[in-house]
């Protein structure tokens, strides 16, 4: 007998053993087929969230499956240094002590960051272990460790030497609070209610006439270089080429024609400010205007405008109106609007809904800023230095396109190819510099004249310059730069290693759609460019894990579920503290608290890692977002318990008994049709689950396994086995015990990729009993292979007859309202010999006996069922009055519930305004109540006949 199922106990025991025994490491036998998988490195600042648990369940499931298929598997884990996120965390810690990074200086500050990383950096990898990830921890990397730093430098230098990295002035997303450029992924578009200001721009040769320009950003007016109109807009064609007076400045700017302008938007006249708007930048570039920068890096108005051409060359600047100099952009907006009003330039202000770009870390409004940055050229052709391959001579962007167009990289689901191509066809040069201290410092040095020397180290730079006293570039690289190299930086590049031969390309990348461009495309570019190979063969895109209402999980919204809390459980008070700390709007705390109490009135009970993993696997349908339902996790906790209890039953009936293994393996085994049926179902399940794993359909694998184990094995076969063990001869009992063990052991191996802990624990006991312990761990045992010869059609046909008979008897009991504890005799009238079936009925349907008769006995009360040509009748005395009273009371109760639910659904506006999932639940509840009522009414009618 097994002890009670205790997930925590078996999880810690087995994971430690797996890791200590080195089971996660590839054996580097290059004659074996390889399977490798790329882990999206989580931020070193981070803790495990539901998205991690979701994609790591899929990745680990694949790794365990292919390991059991005999592959040389490598799942290399690592963490990302997460430049901005990490620097912010440490700066906030220092701020709490009234210290800034500038007080410490760069070197001391970086020491603090490394100290923090050593203390906190292991949290997420320990949590990955809790989920059961069988990653090779001996190969764990950090994107700023020495090996990765060396690779980053080598890649940067080579790209620079190939003419693919340059420094120039470009428009970037600028976070004035952080004081750095940020990527598009770090910018959130927030819908806000703002204003649209309509401003008069008088004609220079006739100030009485003017065009009206509509803008949401009057504070950038000082940097205007033109007003654009649509060339097809007849209202303004006569003005194209004329000069306008720019309000508040006295400067004149031209009217230009550009198809970017929508005739029906605003007034049809758009101010063009190339240094402070991305769309205007493109318009300005087409018309070769100037770029006039009017803000400093803190987003305050400059005293003197900085002017450049589109080559980034400085031109003669000019003074800006003195009254605005030094004002923050929003203070400047207020002052300028007041001045426009006073001077008669402001026509009207209209309310306007707009999308405001905000930094996801600081919440500050992102400013398009013209700054000097380092870029990777996306469309330029390299000037040599590439490995021979089909990608040689192509630009980085063309390499990435070719990899997907040729089928070398496959997207699953395939529709993501369109998204990928859309991004690639509109690609811009990649801004890779960041004005931070934490990150890979750019390997470039400057002399006093501003000449730049890119080199692997300072000594090499000084050799290039022919002098000493060079100054190192202070900027660091975008975090995505080092992340883009992990497919080969983790396998020993630039050396030609066995790891590169065996594991590049990896088989699959499992990731969310939001980083297809930022990470996936860049890995394809860098890997094809430096190795001549694609980084991975398949890209499996999964959806986002949302809360039960379909909202994105966010700590700032208070709707996050911590996967570790699902594994270990957490009390209500601790859960409330967790969910109401760090809210974006602290005033929503009472609402969050109320919702939490409603959802988890007693906190979250312990589910165990296996139940969490099975839940995630069940959600893993291709590409769809997931609304996480806690009830489903509870259901899969019950499933694990069911497996445990089923194993207990099997052990009770097989331990120290003749099971047809070992010494009695040669003894005859008289298999019954249920034995042959369950073995046939096992082989069908092996086929289906193998197909599901190999096509990334973990949802189908989970569904198939659940149905087989719960319905076929536990609900049907175990119950039929009880009959065989009680009534069968020695040969029949031996066959049943043999089948019980054989099918259970194979099912445990089928389940192992999804639920590794419980399967390891049970397999260690079950496998030796059926001569199946071929390895020290289930994770090293071979995955089951289907044998179609064991699918016996006659056994399936016989099982269908038996299931129909049992279903008919159960329906009869239900129709007659016979309580579960009441036993009754069954009479079966049939010309066929049903002896093989009837022996199972008493135990399966709580009968005193099941008897085949030539004709059913006479009875006025007993209903008759027909099943496969046989007539069935239960003989039982019924107290009609008592049963009528009971059913009438039940009907009354059901009617009240129906009335209440119908009233709710017919309430005006409810079905349109209530959350869709609640409306669907109410409709499902209504259908269920109506079905119950119909059955009760049917029984009452029969009693009255």
Swiss-Prot record:
Residues annotated as binding ATP: 555
Subunit structure: Monomer.
Domain of life: Bacteria
InterPro entries in alphabetical order: aa-tRNA-synth_I_CS, aa-tRNA-synth_Ia, Anticodon_Ia_Val, M/V/L/I-tRNA-synth_anticd-bd, Rossmann-like_a/b/a_fold, tRNA-bd_arm, tRNAsynth_Ia_anticodon-bd, Val-tRNA_synth_C_sf
Motif 'KMSKS' region location, chain numbering: 552-556
Keyword list, A-Z: Aminoacyl-tRNA synthetase, ATP-binding, Coiled coil, Cytoplasm, Ligase, Nucleotide-binding, Protein biosynthesis
Alphabetical list of CDD domains matching this protein: Anticodon_Ia_Val (cd07962), ValRS_core (cd00817)
Protein name per the record: Valine--tRNA ligase
Reaction it catalyzes: tRNA(Val) + L-valine + ATP = L-valyl-tRNA(Val) + AMP + diphosphate
EC number: 6.1.1.9
Chief localisation class: cytoplasm
Cell compartment(s), UniProt: Cytoplasm
GO molecular function: aminoacyl-tRNA deacylase activity; ATP binding; valine-tRNA ligase activity
Intervals of motif 'HIGH' region: 42-52
HAMAP family: Val_tRNA_synth_type1
PANTHER family to which the protein is assigned, alphabetical: VALINE--TRNA LIGASE, CHLOROPLASTIC_MITOCHONDRIAL 2 (PTHR11946:SF93), VALYL-TRNA SYNTHETASES (PTHR11946)
Signal peptide (residue range): none
Record function comment: Catalyzes the attachment of valine to tRNA(Val). As ValRS can inadvertently accommodate and process structurally similar amino acids such as threonine, to avoid such errors, it has a 'posttransfer' editing activity that hydrolyzes mischarged Thr-tRNA(Val) in a tRNA-dependent manner.
Organism of origin: Neisseria meningitidis serogroup B (strain ATCC BAA-335 / MC58)
Record-stated family: Belongs to the class-I aminoacyl-tRNA synthetase family. ValS type 1 subfamily.
PROSITE patterns: AA_TRNA_LIGASE_I (PS00178)
NCBIfam families: PRK05729.1, valS
Coiled coil: 879-945
GO biological process, one term: valyl-tRNA aminoacylation
One Gene Ontology cellular component annotation held by this UniProt entry: cytosol
Domain-level remarks: ValRS has two distinct active sites: one for aminoacylation and one for editing. The misactivated threonine is translocated from the active site to the editing site.
One Pfam family it belongs to: Val_tRNA-synt_C
């Amino acid at each position: 007998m097994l002890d009670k199922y205790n997930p925590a106990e078996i999880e810690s025991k087995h994971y430690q053993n797996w890791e200590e025994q080195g089971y996660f490491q590839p054996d580097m036998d290059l004659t074996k087929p390889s399977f490798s998988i790329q882990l999206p490195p989580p931020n070193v600042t981070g803790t495990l969230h539901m998205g991690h648990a979701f994609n790591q369940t899929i990745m680990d499931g694949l790794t365990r499956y292919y390991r059991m298929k005999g592959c040389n598997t490598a799942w290399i884990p690592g963490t990302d240094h997460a430049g901005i996120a990490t620097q912010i965390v440490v700066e906030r810690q220092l701020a709490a002590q009234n210290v800034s990074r500038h007080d410490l200086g760069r070197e001391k500050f970086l020491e603090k960051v490394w100290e923090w990383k050593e203390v906190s950096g292991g949290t997420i990898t320990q949590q990955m272990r809790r989920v059961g990830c069988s990653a090779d921890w001996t190969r764990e990397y950090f994107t700023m460790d020495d090996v990765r730093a060396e690779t980053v430098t080598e890649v940067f230098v080579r790209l620079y030497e190939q003419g693919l990295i340059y420094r120039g002035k470009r428009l970037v997303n600028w976070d004035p609070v952080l004081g750095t450029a940020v990527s598009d992924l770090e910018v959130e578009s927030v819908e806000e209610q703002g204003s649209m200001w309509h401003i008069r721009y008088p004609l220079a040769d006739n100030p009485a006439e003017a065009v009206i320009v509509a803008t949401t950003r009057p504070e950038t007016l000082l940097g205007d270089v033109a007003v654009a109109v649509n060339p097809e807009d007849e209202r303004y064609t006569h003005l194209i080429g004329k000069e306008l007076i720019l309000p508040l400045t006295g400067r004149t700017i031209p009217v230009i024609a550009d198809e970017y302008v929508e005739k029906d938007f605003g007034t049809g006249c758009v101010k063009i400010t190339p240094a402070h708007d991305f769309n205007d930048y493109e318009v300005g570039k087409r018309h070769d205007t100037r770029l006039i920068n009017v803000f400093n890096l803190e987003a305050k108005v400059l005293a003197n405008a900085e002017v450049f051409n589109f080559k980034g060359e400085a031109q003669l600047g000019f003074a800006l109106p003195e009254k605005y100099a030094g004002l923050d952009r929003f203070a400047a907006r207020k002052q300028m609007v007041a001045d426009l009003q006073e001077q008669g330039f402001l026509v009207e202000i209209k309310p306007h809904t707009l999308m405001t770009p905000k930094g996801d870390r600081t919440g500050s409004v992102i400013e398009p800023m013209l700054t000097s940055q380092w870029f990777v050229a996306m469309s330029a052709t390299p000037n040599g230095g590439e490995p021979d391959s089909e990608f040689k001579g192509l630009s980085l962007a063309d390499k990435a396109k070719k990899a997907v167009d040729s089928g070398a990289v496959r997207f699953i689901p395939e529709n993501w190819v369109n998204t990928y191509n859309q991004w690639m066809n509109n690609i811009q040069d990649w801004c890779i510099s960041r004005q931070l201290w934490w990150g890979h410092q750019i390997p470039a040095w400057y002399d006093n004249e501003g000449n730049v020397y890119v080199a692997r180290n300072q000594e090499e730079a000084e050799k290039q310059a022919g002098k000493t006293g060079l100054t190192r570039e202070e900027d660091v690289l975008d975090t995505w730069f080092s992340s883009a190299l992990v497919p080969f930086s983790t396998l020993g590049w630039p050396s030609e290693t066995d790891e590169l031969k065996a594991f590049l390309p990896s088989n699959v990348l499992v990731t969310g759609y939001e980083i297809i461009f930022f990470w996936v495309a860049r890995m394809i570019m860098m890997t094809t460019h430096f190795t001549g190979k694609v980084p991975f063969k398949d890209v499996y895109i999964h959806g986002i894990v949302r809360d039960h209402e379909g909202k994105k999980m966010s700590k700032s919204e208070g709707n996050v579920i911590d996967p570790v809390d699902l594994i270990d459980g957490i009390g209500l008070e601790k859960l409330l503290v967790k969910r109401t700390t760090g809210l974006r709007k602290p005033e929503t705390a009472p609402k969050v608290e109320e919702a939490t109490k409603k959802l988890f009135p007693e906190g979250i009970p312990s589910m165990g890692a296996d139940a969490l993993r099975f839940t995630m696997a069940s959600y893993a349908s291709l590409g769809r977002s997931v609304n996480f339902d806690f009830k489903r996790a509870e259901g899969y906790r019950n499933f694990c318990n069911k497996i445990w209890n089923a194993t207990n039953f099997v052990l009770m009936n097989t331990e120290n008994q003749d099971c047809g293994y070992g010494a009695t393996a040669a003894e005859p085994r008289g298999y019954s049709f249920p034995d042959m049926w369950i073995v046939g179902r096992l082989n069908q399940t092996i086929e289906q689950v193998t197909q599901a794993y190999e096509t990334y359909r973990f949802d189908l694998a989970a569904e198939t396994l659940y149905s087989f184990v719960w319905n076929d094995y536990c609900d049907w076969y175990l119950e039929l086995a009880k009959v065989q063990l009680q009534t069968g001869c020695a040969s029949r009992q031996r066959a049943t015990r043999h089948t019980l063990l054989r099918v259970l052991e194979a099912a445990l191996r089928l389940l192992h990729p999804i639920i590794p802990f419980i399967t390891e624990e049970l397999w260690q006991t079950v496998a030796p009993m059926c001569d199946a312990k071929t390895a020290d761990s289930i994770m090293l045992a071979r995955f089951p292979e289907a044998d179609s010869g064991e699918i016996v059609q006659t056994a399936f046909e016989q099982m269908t007859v038996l299931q129909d008979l049992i279903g008919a008897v159960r329906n009869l009991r239900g129709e007659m309202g016979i309580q579960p504890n009441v036993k009754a005799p069954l009479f079966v009238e049939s010309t066929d010999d049903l002896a093989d079936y009837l022996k199972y009925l008493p135990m399966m349907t709580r009968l005193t006996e099941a008897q085949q008769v030539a004709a059913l006995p006479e009875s006025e009360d007993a209903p008759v069922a027909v099943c496969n040509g046989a007539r069935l009748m239960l003989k039982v005395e019924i107290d009609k009055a008592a049963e009528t009273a009971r059913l009438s009371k039940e009907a009354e109760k059901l009617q009240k519930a129906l009335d209440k639910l119908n009233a709710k659904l017919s309430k005006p506006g409810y079905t349109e305004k209530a959350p869709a999932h609640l409306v669907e639940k109410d409709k499902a509840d209504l259908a269920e109540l109506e079905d119950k009522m119909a059955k009760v009414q049917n029984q009452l009618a029969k009693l009255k006949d």
